[in-house]
């Protein structure tokens, strides 16, 4: 169904955020990354950036690619992660609502065509990106277990992902 594809199909799929290289981003004319936090960069119950995340962030910075965390997480969670590393962020973003996607674009100073959203959820990250008309990358969740608030979204996502698999629109496994 076209509506499912329009709303929930990401531009790209990767296994993890580390697979998103500056070379890939530059090849797609991307100058800024908006990324989810929980289960995209770190597990939802992991408070701090680990060495792999910090290395990835430095790789983006060294390539002049801007970064902003766009998270539905509360301010203390997101600020506690982002501020020690000088990362711009928007917490309590209410994704897939559009307002904070637009705010993120303003904070980054980039156009939609040069910005990409990275996230692990179709129902929030990808739907929001598609609604605001920016490219998106769906990553496999860092941790199989999610917070309680994500449970229903994951059940709906399974149905949508099965549809995408049946139509050969995705290539990686659950």
Question: Where would I find each of the regions flagged by the language model?
Answer:
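Asp-based, Mg2+/Mn2+-dependent phosphohydrolase catalytic module
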Residues: 2-35, 42, 46-47, 52-117, ...
């Amino acid at each position: 169904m076209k509506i499912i594809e329009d709303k929930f199909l990401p531009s790209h799929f990767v296994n993890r955020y580390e697979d998103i290289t500056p070379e890939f981003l530059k090849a797609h004319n991307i100058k800024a990354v908006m990324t989810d936090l929980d289960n995209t960069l770190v597990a939802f119950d992991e408070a701090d950036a680990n060495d792999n995340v910090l290395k990835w962030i430095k790789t983006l910075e060294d390539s002049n690619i801007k970064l902003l965390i766009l998270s539905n997480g509360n301010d203390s969670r997101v600020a506690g992660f982002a501020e020690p590393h000088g990362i711009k962020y928007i917490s309590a973003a209410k994704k897939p609502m559009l307002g904070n996607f637009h705010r993120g674009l303003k904070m980054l100073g980039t156009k939609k065509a040069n910005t990409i959203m990275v996230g692990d959820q179709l129902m929030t990250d990808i739907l929001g990106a598609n609604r605001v008309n920016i490219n998106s990358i769906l990553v496999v969740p860092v941790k199989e277990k999610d917070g309680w608030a994500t449970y229903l979204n994951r059940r709906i996502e399974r149905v949508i992902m099965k549809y995408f698999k049946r139509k050969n629109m995705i290539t990686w496994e659950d």
